[in-house]
């Protein structure tokens, strides 16, 4: 079957590409390897506690057998189990001494259903970092190139947040921010008084606080502050492919969706320097088929897209499609997590907060920006969370009887956690390859993921732990516990970098518009395109790059240049 465009993957990147291409009048096929999911119908966000098995916990034996890796994600529960793959059915290879956690889900909408919804822009501190300190290659774009596209995707997605005027964290098109609670306001006041170059602000998140007519026309409503977001939101209050981009694409009449279709490889026509076809395997019947289009967007997620490229070998690309540079699969990055500190606060016992706010607070990067005293390059930011302990704290306390139960009716002490997100440097030996002898049940070679942190990440983590503990202590917190070892790569679920953008085809896979140097009608806009990781959550950047690349591709098609 022939289309104007094929988009592989329906998550945050694929959804945006499909929306933009369809809006430009292109007949677009969206290929999703997982099952079809119907927005609202297939969510458990309205399930009452007694309707969810085992008090929303997955039995330990089931976790160990089927979800050993997926269950390490904080969003994993009985009510969200449907959004994660069974590790037992979707294996991959990773060294025991250098483990990588590949956390994923196969279904329409992908991880746009379960993402953390934190939305921050990269700045020129990020886009110029590689060139300035010599780690990796230079980004082929700067902030000015992508800023209008940040504007575009923020307005459509709906981002709540507060403007702060920081060069390292550019402001955006914000809906009204959610409020900080009393403890966070006190912490903000103390941190900013002690450290004038540091800032505490509410987390910028993809939640509608005041829906616009465009949001309402798509059936989206305001956030109800229930904080069961990872189950899927029947109100459409947070941005996902299912609540926003795919409905918008479907309204054009130009979108065709195929689910349960696993991409086996991309065929290449050397004479035309083009992808000539997309071969897929039906996940249920294992029958094969092929689709053709004038342009192909690969948005299957970083590791899955890398797997497809490496599997698409040919006489002209013996090590994988678009891989003359030997870069495909290399420079895998994730954010440095498992860092920070936590503590309890003795005050504010007469204060509480309203609802279950779906975001925390944010303390943007300052080291090697406004405070140039790190013994490492790059930096980190903190995402913070605070609240009062509830009745369930009784499980860790000694007590029985009416008096004990009565005491638990009163909220407990305040606590706060500063969760660090640090930048990981791009290194060639952090790599995704195909296993030489093992394949999945559809005959596709398994990926082998070999990735570890280096000395720069370890020094960065030590500083983050120390700073977090010091800021909590200065603000009057007690029982402060700094974090220990860095979590294994993959735990941030921000994997990126394996088909990076760059100026030079000899050292990169993609040009400044996410177009493959070696294959004129192939574009890649998921996390694999990232040239460095920055310190902020990357999803908003994926959205902006996807919208930008899709419109550039549409322009090239209109002019006959591809």
What residues fall within each predicted segment?
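N-terminal glycine-rich phosphate/pyrophosphate-binding loop and immediately adjacent elements
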Residues: 1-130, 135, 140-151, 304, ...
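Glycine-rich loop(s) and the adjacent beta-strand/alpha-helix scaffold that form part
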Residues: 23, 27, 34-53, 235, ...
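Short, glycine/acidic-rich hinge or "gate" loops at secondary-structure transitions
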Residues: 39-41, 160-172, 478-486, 559-562
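Conserved redox-cofactor binding core of oxidoreductases
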Residues: 54-86, 90-101, 106-107, 115-121, ...
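Short, hydrophobic/aromatic-rich segments at coil-to-beta transitions
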Residues: 273-279, 415
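A conserved FAD-binding loop/helix module that cradles the flavin
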Residues: 532-550
């Amino acid at each position: 079957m022939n289309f104007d465009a094929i988009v592989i993957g329906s998550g945050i990147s694929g959804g945006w590409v499909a929306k933009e291409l369809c809006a430009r009048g292109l007949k677009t096929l969206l290929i999703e390897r997982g099952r079809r999911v119907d927005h609202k119908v297939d969510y458990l966000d309205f399930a009452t506690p007694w309707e969810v098995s085992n008090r929303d916990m997955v039995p330990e034996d089931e976790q160990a057998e089927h979800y050993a890796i997926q269950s390490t994600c904080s969003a994993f529960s009985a009510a969200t189990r449907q959004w994660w793959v069974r590790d037992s059915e979707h294996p991959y290879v990773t060294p025991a001494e250098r483990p990588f956690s590949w956390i994923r889900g196969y279904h329409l909408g992908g991880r746009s259903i379960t993402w953390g919804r934190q939305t921050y822009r990269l700045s020129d501190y990020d886009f110029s970092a590689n060139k300035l300190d010599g780690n990796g290659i230079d980004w082929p774009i700067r902030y000015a190139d992508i800023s209008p596209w940040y504007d575009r995707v923020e307005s459509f997605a709906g981002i709540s947040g507060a403007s702060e005027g920081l060069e390292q964290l550019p402001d955006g098109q914000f809906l009204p921010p959610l409020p900080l609670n009393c403890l966070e306001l006190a912490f903000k006041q103390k941190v900013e008084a002690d450290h004038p170059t540091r800032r505490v602000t509410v987390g910028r998140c993809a939640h509608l606080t005041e829906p616009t007519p465009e949001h309402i026309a798509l059936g989206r409503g305001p956030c109800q502050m229930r904080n069961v977001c990872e189950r899927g939101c029947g109100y459409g209050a947070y941005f996902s492919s299912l609540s926003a981009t795919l409905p918008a694409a479907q309204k054009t009449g130009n979108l065709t969706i195929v689910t349960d279709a696993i991409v086996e490889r991309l065929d290449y026509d050397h004479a035309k320097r083009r992808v000539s076809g997309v071969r897929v395997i039906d996940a249920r019947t294992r029958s094969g088929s092929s689709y053709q289009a004038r342009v192909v967007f690969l948005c299957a997620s970083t590791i899955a897209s890398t797997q497809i490229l490496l599997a698409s070998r040919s006489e002209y690309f013996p090590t994988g499609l678009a891989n003359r540079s030997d870069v495909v699969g290399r420079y895998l990055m994730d954010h440095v997590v498992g860092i920070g500190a936590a503590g309890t606060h003795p005050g504010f016992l007469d204060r509480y907060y309203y609802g279950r706010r779906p975001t925390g607070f944010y303390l943007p990067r300052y080291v090697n920006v406004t405070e140039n005293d790190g013994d490492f390059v790059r930096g980190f930011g903190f995402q913070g969370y605070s609240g009062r302990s509830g009745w369930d704290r009784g499980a860790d306390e000694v007590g029985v009887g009416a008096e004990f139960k009565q005491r638990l009716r009163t909220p407990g002490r305040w606590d706060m956690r500063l969760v660090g997100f640090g930048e990981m440097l791009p290194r060639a030996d952090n790599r995704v390859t195909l296993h030489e002898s093992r394949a999945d049940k559809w005959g596709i070679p398994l990926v082998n993921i070999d990735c570890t942190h280096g000395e720069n990440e370890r020094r960065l983590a030590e500083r983050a732990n120390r700073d977090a503990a010091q800021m909590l202590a200065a603000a009057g917190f007690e029982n402060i516990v700094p974090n220990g070892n860095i979590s294994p790569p993959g735990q941030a679920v921000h994997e990126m970098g394996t088909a990076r953008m760059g100026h030079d085809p000899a050292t990169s896979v993609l040009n400044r518009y996410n177009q493959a140097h070696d294959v004129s009608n192939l574009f890649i806009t998921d996390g694999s395109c990232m040239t460095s990781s920055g310190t902020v959550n990357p999803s908003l950047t994926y959205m902006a790059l996807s919208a930008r690349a899709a419109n550039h591709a549409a322009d090239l098609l209109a002019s006959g240049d591809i």
